[in-house]
């Protein structure tokens, strides 16, 4: 089953932390979940968040805290913090709640699956050969110290009439092993022939289980 399921969801609360941290009763849960999705979709479209690797949403008594994980913190912060203040104002308007924005820098972007997938997508959109983009990504990930990496692209590759999938793999990527720290992400490239889907798996080694205190007693959700 590890081959078919999402590696992140498969390991959530085992070796992966929740991406949304809050409690909601039966009446609030659906509302909070939809609000989380709106926040993420809004941030993904912002130019200042283009280098973002992910978002964590935390709720505390009428207040929302959004942590943006990015390889380019200066772009998100803006000149004298202007961009962050703008994000706060727009998110407050979207949610009708006070929103606090935190910035967390991704120290090693070559080992972040989302940033690698986005990089491949941008290259394909610039008409770089998909095979060249995939092989270059594999090499940079392995050079950064990963134990294994797998990259898959799907769609009308190189303008072919029939859609297909191709993948390259280097090293070990054990999808069934729960203690294996597998980072996984998807991205899409918009081309003149249609949408090209990209999937990236990166094996970062073995990891200890997440402490129970991080998820005990919380009806959290791992919305992407």
From Swiss-Prot:
Its lineage opens with: Bacteria, Pseudomonadati, Chlamydiota, Chlamydiia, Chlamydiales
Entry's family note: Belongs to the universal ribosomal protein uS3 family.
Gene symbol of the encoding locus: rpsC
Q: Which organism is it from?
A: Chlamydia trachomatis serovar D (strain ATCC VR-885 / DSM 19411 / UW-3/Cx)
Q: Which GO terms describe its biological process?
A: translation
- This one is known as Small ribosomal subunit protein uS3
Task: Kindly give the SMART domains that the UniProt entry links to this protein.
Answer: KH (SM00322)
What GO cellular component entries does it have? cytosolic small ribosomal subunit
Q: Which PANTHER family match?
A: 30S/40S RIBOSOMAL PROTEIN S3, SMALL RIBOSOMAL SUBUNIT PROTEIN US3C
What keyword terms does UniProt attach to this protein? Ribonucleoprotein, Ribosomal protein, RNA-binding, rRNA-binding
Cross-referenced Pfam families? KH_2, Ribosomal_S3_C
Question: Mind telling me which InterPro entries this protein's record contains?
Answer: KH_dom (IPR004087), KH_dom-like_a/b (IPR015946), KH_dom_type_2 (IPR004044), KH_sf_prok-type (IPR009019), Ribosomal_S3_C_sf (IPR036419), Ribosomal_uS3_bac-typ (IPR005704), Ribosomal_uS3_C (IPR001351), Ribosomal_uS3_CS (IPR018280)
Q: Where is the KH type-2 domain?
A: 39-107
**Gene Ontology terms, MF aspect:** mRNA binding; rRNA binding; structural constituent of ribosome
Q: What does this protein do?
A: Binds the lower part of the 30S subunit head. Binds mRNA in the 70S ribosome, positioning it for translation.
Q: How does it assemble?
A: Part of the 30S ribosomal subunit. Forms a tight complex with proteins S10 and S14.
